[in-house]
Regions:
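Residues within the helices of the helix-turn-helix
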Residues: 32
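N-terminal intrinsically disordered/low-complexity leader segments
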Residues: 1-6
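Flexible coil/turn residues that form the inter-helical turn or adjacent wing/linker of helix-turn-helix
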Residues: 24-27, 159
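Amphipathic alpha-helical packing segments from all-alpha helical-bundle domains
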Residues: 105-149
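An amphipathic alpha-helix adjacent to DNA-recognition modules
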Residues: 10-18, 27-28, 36-39, 46-75, ...
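Helical hydrophobic small-molecule/effector-binding pocket
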Residues: 76-122
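C-terminal peripheral helix-coil segments that are non-catalytic and often amphipathic
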Residues: 145, 153-178
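Cytosolic nucleotide-binding catalytic cores of signal-transduction proteins
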Residues: 23-24, 130-131, 175
Length: 178
C-alpha cells in the first residue's frame, strides 16, 4: 500500500511525463529532464521506475484500468455500449492521444482491445456472426484495427465530429462486415 507521499511523487512524475510528451517523443525525454519538470529528484524517480518508458507503461495501465472500470457500469446500463464508450474516450481524448502517439500502436491496440469490458462488446458481435471461427478471427482483427484508426484520427482532429456521428460510422462499418 502506497502512502500519500509516494502517490504524490508518482502523480508529479506522471504529470511531468505527459507534459513532456506533448512536446517531444518518449525516446527524446531524459530522466534528468523529466525530474526537472516534475520537481522530483532522480533518486526518487529511480526508486519507483527504471526509465521513462516504464513510467509511461504505468500511465497506460492506469488509463486502461480506469477505462475498464468506467465502462463496466456503462455497459451494464446499455445494450448498445458503443456510444458510452465513445463518449468516455472523447472526454479523455488528450490522454488517449498521448498514449497512442507514445506507444507502439500494435501494443496499445492489443492492450485496449484486451480490456474485459471492450472485449465483451466485440465478443457479442462475434456471437451474432454466422462466419467460421477462422473468418471471425480475421474479421474481428480487421474491425479492431479499423476502429483504432478511426478513433485515432477522430480524437486527434482539431475539431472532432460529434460522438453520435462516429458511433454511426462504426456501426455502419460493423454491419457491412458482420
Amino acid at each position: 500500500m502506497e502512502n500519500q507521499r509516494i502517490r504524490i511523487s508518482k502523480a508529479m512524475l506522471k504529470s511531468g511525463l505527459l507534459k513532456l510528451l506533448k512536446e517531444k517523443p518518449l525516446n527524446q525525454i531524459s530522466v534528468y529532464e523529466l525530474c526537472a519538470v516534475s520537481q522530483i529528484n532522480r533518486t526518487t524517480f529511480y526508486k519507483y521506475y527504471g526509465s521513462p518508458a516504464e513510467l509511461l507503461n504505468e500511465i497506460e495501465t492506469d488509463f486502461m484500468a480506469q477505462l475498464d472500470e468506467d465502462l463496466k457500469s456503462m455497459i451494464a446500463q446499455s445494450i448498445n455500449a458503443l456510444l458510452p464508450v465513445l463518449n468516455h474516450l472523447y472526454e479523455h481524448r488528450e490522454l488517449f492521444c498521448l498514449l497512442i502517439r507514445s506507444m507502439p500502436e500494435q501494443e496499445f491496440a492489443a492492450h485496449l482491445f484486451s480490456i474485459p469490458s471492450i472485449s465483451i462488446i466485440f465478443d457479442n458481435m462475434a456471437d451474432e456472426s454466422s462466419y467460421s471461427e477462422t473468418k471471425t478471427k480475421y474479421i474481428r482483427r480487421f474491425i479492431f484495427q479499423g476502429t483504432l484508426t478511426v478513433l485515432r484520427d477522430w480524437l486527434n482532429s482539431e475539431s472532432p465530429e460529434p460522438v453520435a456521428e462516429i458511433a454511426d460510422v462504426l456501426t455502419v462499418l460493423r454491419r457491412k462486415l458482420w
